[in-house]
Amino acid sequence: RPWLLRLIREVSGVEGIERIRLGSLEPRIITGEFAAELARLPKLCPHFHLSLQSGCDATLKRMNRHYNTEEYRERCGILREAFDNPAITTDVIVGFPGETEEEFAATRQYLEQVHFYEMHVFKYSKRAGTRAAVMPDQVPDQVKGRRSDGLLELEASMSREYREHFIGSSVWVLFEDMAEVEGRKYIIGHTPQYVKAALDILPAFYLSH
């Protein structure tokens, strides 16, 4: 943790770098002190990806994860206390061996309670040589698909709700690309929270660039 903070501070001091966005973080790295130090860096984007994998403690134990759902929830709370409406994203695996309907329901309820901006939902697939590949109670592909579809619907709803918080507000956008939709040209970029934004390009602007 100390070396990561030192690195972020050093990068923050580099002239010309205006945004620092962190990659995936281990949940246990998030402490009150760590989050408070990050919040003091104006270039640090309030977008944090904390991999969860499952919202059920029994499933997490079979996955050999070194945290539980309550610890994870506390980490999200720390970030939300340190930053104003941070974007928290995560990874979730459905259909891990032994995942029952009750465990999946617990995961879905947990995700709804913690509330994420985005979730990357993956269906568990066997990998030769891993402990999970030979575990009993492998989940059928059809069940994995149904569970994945359900969480993707939830993800779309939560993401839309998070983005709606910014309607009517002024935000900084880093424009990085151009796109054309139905004959109209737009410049595309992201806010510090990694919310995608599009700005209609006036014809005169487009021709001059």
Protein language model regions, located:
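Flexible glycine/acidic-rich beta-alpha junction loops that bind and position SAM and/or redox cofactors
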Residues: I29-E33, L52-M63, V94-E101, E118-Q142, ...
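Radical SAM enzyme [4Fe-4S]-AdoMet core and its adjacent flexible, acidic
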Residues: R1-S12, G16, R62-M63, K126-S157
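Terminal RNA-binding accessory module
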Residues: V134-H209
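Conserved SAM/AdoMet-binding glycine-rich loop
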Residues: R1-E101, E112
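A glycine- and small/hydrophobic-rich beta-loop-beta segment
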Residues: V92, F104-V114, V121
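Hydrophobic, well-ordered secondary-structure elements that form the walls
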Residues: L50, D91, L111, M119, ...
